[in-house]
A protein has these predicted regions:
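Conserved Lys-Pro-Asp/Glu-containing loop-to-beta segment of HAD-superfamily phosphomonoesterases
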Residues: 109-122
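Alpha-helical substrate-recognition element adjacent to the catalytic core
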Residues: 1-104
Length: 122
């Protein structure tokens, strides 16, 4: 059985609106500093967080092996600013292990290579 592969943006998974507003007002340097200063503060769940949590819960219903659902994070953040996102993933116990951080580039080109059948964005 092949898993359902769900690609999700960081902004759909977590509430990044405060940082995004800062980015729009003051630019990338201010945004990066803001995220680094708060890397140990968990992000709040975003609009698609409840759905992702429920999809990943399906993995615990079946015997070990190939999970029925895999969630992949696609983010326009850099790997540096993305540390806060991965810390939040760990904080909430989400089983997300594959991710792409594009440092501002479009994330859409990664959907097909990861084999995603569903793409969630906010």
């Amino acid at each position: 059985m092949r898993p359902l592969v769900v690609a999700i943006t960081a902004r759909a998974l977590f509430d990044l609106e405060d940082g995004h507003a800062l980015f729009e007002r003051e630019g990338l340097k201010a945004y990066a500093a803001y995220q680094r200063e708060r890397e140990d503060q968990p992000l709040q769940p975003g609009i698609a967080f409840p759905l992702v949590r429920k999809l990943l819960a399906l993995n615990s219903l079946l015997p070990p092996g190939v999970p029925p659902v895999e969630v992949i994070l696609l983010s326009r953040n850099s790997a540096d600013t993305g540390l806060r996102i991965f810390n939040a993933i760990e904080h909430f116990g989400l089983g997300i292990v594959r991710a792409v951080f594009t440092s501002g580039a479009d994330t859409h080109p990664y959907i097909q290579p990861f084999g995603a059948q569903l793409f969630l964005s906010a």
